[in-house]
Amino acid sequence: MKKQLNPKYDHLQVEKDKYQYWLDKNLFKADINSNKPKFSIILPPPNVTGKLHIGHAWDTSLQDAIIRFKKLTGYDTLFLPGMDHSGISTQVKVEAKLKQQGIDKNKLGREKFLLEAWKWKEEYANIIRKQWAKLGLSLDYSTEKFTLDEDINQIVKEIFVKFYNDQIIYKDKQIVNWDPEQKTAISNVEVIYKETQSKMYYFKYILEDSNEYLTVATTRPETMFADQCLVVNPNDSRYQKYINKKVINPVNKQVIPIISDEYVDIEFGTGVMKCTPAHDLNDYHLGIKHNLKMPICLNIDGSVNQLGGKYQGLDRFVARKKIIKNAIKEDLFVKEEDIINQVGFSERSNAIVEPYLSDQWFVKMDKFKNMVIDLQNSDNKINFYPNRFSDVLNRWMTDAHDWCISRQLWWGHQIPCWYHKKTNEMYVGINPPSDIENWTQDQDVLDTWFSSGLWAFSTLLNNKGLESEYFKNYFPTSVLVTGYDIIFFWVARMIFQTLEYTKQIPFKDVLIHGLVRDESNRKMSKSLGNGIDPMDVINNNGCDSLRLFLLTNSTPGQDIRYSNEKILASWNFINKLWNASRYVFLNLDEDFKFDPNFYKTDLEITNQWILTQLSKTQTYVYEKMNKYEFSLAGNHLWDFVWNKYCSWYIEFSKVNLNNDKFTHQTKQTLFYVLKEILIMLHPLIPFVSEEIYLNMMLKESILLEQWTNLNSNYDTSFIDDVIKMITSIREFRNTKNIKNDVCLSVNISNTNQNHTKLFKKHFDQIYNFLFNFCNTKLVDEAIKNKTSLSIDEYFIEIANDSFINKNELIKELEQKQNYLNNEITRSQKILNNQEFIKKAKPEKIQSEKIKYQNYLDQLQAIKDKLKELTND
């Protein structure tokens, strides 16, 4: 073997054609006939509204890292891709595009509009697939799904009909959140409440046949046309005499009654409220209670309808101004006040949302809320990472209201309900009525989240229902990776819809992540213009650098702060790995062959040391990856590669490669440890790990390798002390400007019992290390004229009067003494904290006790040394 990497790491060259290579080798394809254990992830489908953003890059990198890790650890994996039609969002985009071309959606008609929407979908689906490739996602494209695929559409209809027949879905006229710009109902979670500078308007409602009036405050005068009564509290002595009397509505002169209800807060405002059941949720419930009529005074576009008389056709906010102007003229206006209140805006159009009485389809939530809460309180609960989000889910489900699932859109799953043209009979079914010419289908479509809620299993059925082999093998899916912002939007709905239809949970684990924030810790948004295009980062620094940054900064449930500096640090890490790999390849002979049994020979101590460190790293990384703790796994691996392998073992190997006795085993060790490093790094940095691996001429791909662990446990702990000694002596040379060709004599003093034994046992080896790596002779007798370097509880005494600076040494030791005193205080507080003792794992408590004792030992050694120095 004689392979050489390019002298310089070039991410563009490394990442070029790799993805196609993986696809050509079918390395991402699930093997349904494999006897390996199954592991599956269904990709949360991105919306076909546009390109992927940095949040998608993070979300998908997490999933891909899990899939690659599981593949390397012996699983048959399925990573199923798909996209979401995203009803309202996509329709808004397509409408805007048509508008730019001078085309009106309504004139175009439904069928032709849908053709335009499908063109949009195809265009952006292709863009998204290219972005998936740039991100290196190991997706099985043979299983790709779209939420409007015919087989998915069939499942959606089947479940709608089942839920309807089971009386879970119903149609009713209720108050909904209405987007007057998009002319559709939207769900509660699609309403964004913002603190807004508003006004409160006070009007006179004059009593019938009297000059008296009651003052009523409202923020929405345009809804007064639909007022049905005034309401006062029966216990409010100010207004008891007016109950059952009548007043004249100041905007339309209609006579309406005054009724009483304890719902009215005596202390709020004037204590009199107007009741408009069709335009306010609380008023709606009062209307039902008191059997009030519910006329609607606004059109679906937010303009005033025929109830507004002379105001008919005016936009609601234009009408508001005119109503106030005319009320002033008629002396029916009292005053206006500036207020700050919470106003609901549509998440998609940013229009102010209207509470609006409308015929809609709903899902009953009573059964489902109990279903989810009971599940999460059982032994079969879905595991949330971190666990606190299971409680968040339970709280949201406790407060859940019936879910409005109909949308007044064209793009989406049209509701499978037909109305008879003559009798208005309603028919709900998977297939249309046989005499279709006599029926008209419901024009509404389903809320996008209804079909998305079926995603975990509908993607696996392939027109074969629950008998599908994919469903049998890969369901429930292994883990869902998603953001905390859509736990109720999506996660909860997937759980209860899946449970209701399949009687199984949709996934075993849920890994929750946060948001990607900018470098100033602000949420990324179009309005701030602070978004990051992941494709730009990939072009400039490589996909591996982006993924390494995202994954090594990923803590379950937490936000991540984007950092150009950390992206560059990731690139530098990969560059160091590249250069280390070049060093390995340059030192291998033409006829080098890897011997998988090389470690069974009598290995030199540094080869033993790196294999022991490797084994510890493999164990740690494996454990943390299985718990989705990517930051801990990645940073531990980073430290091992950078510090132990590149910085120290490669340096040790240079000596061994010049010793015929150790040359062969050192080459084998260099090669083997590099291979294992690449396998561990592959889930994080797939492109460069594959490139280096292919140069090792082993298998067709690193994805065909197996995550292993030699369980090496050689007695090499003294090497860690050697490294500390070498580092301290080198730092001492640099600080004192002592050239490397000046040989230093040193002695080790103040060792505790363990170190005394250890250093005695390995004296000759330590001598050789210090001599070879920092031109230092280790002597076994005390040195009188010396400079002392503190390492843990012991000292390195350097014999050379010209280097002594007693005052500086005392100062350094006093600083370390202060540091240790602080650490001892901190450790004491922790160990005296009963909550910590009660909740912490035993190994965590033991670790803190060991630290505490080490601090005490080090402090005593420094005190003794300071005493010795001050007595000289």
From Swiss-Prot:
Pfam families: Anticodon_1, tRNA-synt_1. It is an enzyme of class 6 (ligase). ATP binds at residue 526. GO terms for biological process: valyl-tRNA aminoacylation. InterPro entries: aa-tRNA-synth_I_CS, aa-tRNA-synth_Ia, Anticodon_Ia_Val, M/V/L/I-tRNA-synth_anticd-bd, Rossmann-like_a/b/a_fold, tRNA-bd_arm, tRNAsynth_Ia_anticodon-bd, Val-tRNA_synth_C_sf. It catalyses: tRNA(Val) + L-valine + ATP = L-valyl-tRNA(Val) + AMP + diphosphate. One of its GO terms (molecular function) is valine-tRNA ligase activity. A motif ('HIGH' region) lies at residues 46-56. A motif ('KMSKS' region) lies at residues 523-527. CDD domains: Anticodon_Ia_Val (cd07962), ValRS_core (cd00817). It comes from the Bacteria. It is found in: Cytoplasm. Residues 796-872 form a coiled coil. Keywords: Aminoacyl-tRNA synthetase, ATP-binding, Coiled coil, Cytoplasm, Ligase, Nucleotide-binding, Protein biosynthesis. Its EC number is 6.1.1.9. GO terms for cellular component: cytosol. Transmembrane segments: none annotated. Its main location: cytoplasm. Catalyzes the attachment of valine to tRNA(Val). As ValRS can inadvertently accommodate and process structurally similar amino acids such as threonine, to avoid such errors, it has a 'posttransfer' editing activity that hydrolyzes mischarged Thr-tRNA(Val) in a tRNA-dependent manner. PANTHER family: VALINE--TRNA LIGASE, CHLOROPLASTIC_MITOCHONDRIAL 2, VALYL-TRNA SYNTHETASES. Monomer. ValRS has two distinct active sites: one for aminoacylation and one for editing. The misactivated threonine is translocated from the active site to the editing site. HAMAP family: Val_tRNA_synth_type1. Belongs to the class-I aminoacyl-tRNA synthetase family. ValS type 1 subfamily. This is Valine--tRNA ligase.
